[in-house]
């Protein structure tokens, strides 16, 4: 007689469709132990909209709503806006949660919008289980203001205590949540992942020679890639200066991304006499990213604030070795210095230049580290994420 598998009825409340979450929702919808419904507070990202970070209008060119059940909840805010507390006021969440029979509700909204509180109160009154997902890994805010750290230390324990389980995306995140007084048995590490199969498959089909030709870069050159918004906290200027200081023969630097620092970077590139060796591609959409990672020899994420950094996952899956600053959250779980990538002290241009100088011209080393990076990602995948979510559901629903 076959064992009866319990199926969890789960509502996922998400602020808006995200290119990283959609593949997870598709897999979750097919899992025999999950019956999910995704409730979106906004459809920004599906429709073209202005992205303040990129400084341009953005619409992702991969399907975000296919392959899983979802519903859009009307936003009753007079001034709809992501990232604003009163920008998401989705009153319909109340009736959805109160009238349907869910075993648990998972929040992907953050706590800084009114919709979270509307839904959280409904969950508590219905005696459903509340699972809160967060990618936070440090208490320090991006602007490093001390009063914000103090406020977080005071408020976050109370907020996270509302959850039956806090789902964190990294080991650093788990340590941070535990430091706020949340019991270890109430914290679940759910690996922050991308669609591993898609990235590996697309990378294997890339014509590197053709991509290099588009970039106007010789096929036998070595390429350092920066792929992120050109913003101050991403520190792209550190990468430019380290590249200039390393001065590796027959090497090029490619910036993929838009943002407020582009004009400054182009001026500095010109003043350094590197116009022929530094390429600015502008915004690159999702369907073209794998060709960039595969056509580069070394990837750099130099941020001084990066809770995780999923671009690291993407690069590693494409076999591109990574250099990350010690402020990048994924470094602890994914990047073992000298084996699956390299770590340097954030803002230390000399240290970064030294790594570039030693690694970029060493093709054998690049190949070895790139292969190890792909191997590491085998156990940091959507399948591990879903296993962890189901375990969190088992634990939370078994409690009275």
Indicate where each model-derived feature is located:
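Nucleotide-sugar donor phosphate/pyrophosphate-binding loop at the beta->alpha transition
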Residues: 114, 129-131, 138-162
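Donor nucleotide-sugar binding/catalytic pocket of nucleotide-sugar-dependent glycosyltransferases
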Residues: 149, 153-210
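A short, well-ordered alpha-helix in the C-terminal region of glycosyltransferases
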Residues: 213, 277, 351, 358, ...
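Conserved donor-binding/catalytic core segment of Leloir-type glycosyltransferases
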Residues: 218-234, 240-243, 254
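Short alpha-helical donor nucleotide-sugar binding micro-motif in glycosyltransferases
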Residues: 283-284, 291-296
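Aromatic "clamp/platform" in nucleotide-sugar-dependent glycosyltransferases that forms part
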Residues: 304
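Short hydrophobic beta-strand element within catalytic cores of glycosyltransferases
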Residues: 321-325
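Conserved acidic donor-binding segment of nucleotide-sugar-dependent glycosyltransferases
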Residues: 336-338, 342-349, 358-363
């Amino acid at each position: 007689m076959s064992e009866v598998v319990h199926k969890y009825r789960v509502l996922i409340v998400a602020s808006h469709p995200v290119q990283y979450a959609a593949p997870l929702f598709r897999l979750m919808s097919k899992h025999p132990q999950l019956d999910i419904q995704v409730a979106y507070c906004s459809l920004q990202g599906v429709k073209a909209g202005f992205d303040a970070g990129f400084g341009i209008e953005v619409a992702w060119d991969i399907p975000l709503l296919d392959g899983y059940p979802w519903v859009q909840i009307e936003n009753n805010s007079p001034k709809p806006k992501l990232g604003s507390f009163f920008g998401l006021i989705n009153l319909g969440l109340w009736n959805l949660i109160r009238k349907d029979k869910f075993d648990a509700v998972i929040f992907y909204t953050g706590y800084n919008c009114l919709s979270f509180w509307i839904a959280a109160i409904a969950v508590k009154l219905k005696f459903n289980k509340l699972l809160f997902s967060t990618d936070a890994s440090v208490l320090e805010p991006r602007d490093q203001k001390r009063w914000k750290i103090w406020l977080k230390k005071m408020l976050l324990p109370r907020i996270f205590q509302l959850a039956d389980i806090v789902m964190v995306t990294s080991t650093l995140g788990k340590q941070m949540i535990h430091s706020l007084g949340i019991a270890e048995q109430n914290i679940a590490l759910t690996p922050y992942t991308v669609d591993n199969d898609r990235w590996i498959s697309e990378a294997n089909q890339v014509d590197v020679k053709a991509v290099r030709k588009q970039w106007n870069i010789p096929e036998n050159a070595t390429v350092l890639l920066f792929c992120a918004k050109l913003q101050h906290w991403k520190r792209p200027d550190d990468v430019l200066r380290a590249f200039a200081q390393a001065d590796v023969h027959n090497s090029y630097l490619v910036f993929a991304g838009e943002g407020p620092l582009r004009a400054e970077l182009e001026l500095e590139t010109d003043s350094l006499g590197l116009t022929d060796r530094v390429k600015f591609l502008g915004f690159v959409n999702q369907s073209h990213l794998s060709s960039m990672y595969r056509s580069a020899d070394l990837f750099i994420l130099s941020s001084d604030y990066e809770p995780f950094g999923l671009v690291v996952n993407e690069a590693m899956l494409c076999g591109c070795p990574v250099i990350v600053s010690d402020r990048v959250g994924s470094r602890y779980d994914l990047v073992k210095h000298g084996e699956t990538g390299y770590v340097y002290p954030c803002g230390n241009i000399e240290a970064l230049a030294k790594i570039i100088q030693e690694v970029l011209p060493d093709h054998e080393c690049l190949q070895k580290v790139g292969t190890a990076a792909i191997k590491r990602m085998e156990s940091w995948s959507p399948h591990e994420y879903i296993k962890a979510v189901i375990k969190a559901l088992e634990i939370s629903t078994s409690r009275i």
